[in-house]
């Protein structure tokens, strides 16, 4: 699985939410829950483990000459509602 994100945005997200987009890639290495977040552009939310805590990441599925990759948009420590959703769906 390939990932892409803006480095400056990753630094901003880490300062604001305590988790970088680089760290958020870990979510996809384990069991995670996905739902659709918005339709235009089509974005998804994944909830899973990252740096020893539940986190959420918003991503877009994109394509290039090498195939499919995930463009990470933002991430944060999972809310109580997201923790419950994860627990109910794994």
What spans do the regions from the language model cover?
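Ribonuclease/tRNase effector modules and their secretory precursors
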Residues: 1-90
């Amino acid at each position: 699985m390939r990932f892409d994100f803006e480095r400056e945005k990753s630094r901003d997200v880490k300062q604001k939410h305590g988790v970088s987009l680089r760290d958020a890639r870990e979510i996809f290495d384990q069991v995670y829950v996905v739902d659709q977040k918005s339709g235009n552009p089509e974005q998804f939310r994944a909830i899973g483990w990252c740096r020893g805590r539940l986190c959420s990441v918003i991503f877009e599925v994109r394509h290039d000459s090498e195939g499919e990759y995930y463009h990470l948009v933002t991430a944060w420590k999972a809310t109580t509602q997201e923790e419950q959703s994860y627990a109910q769906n794994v």
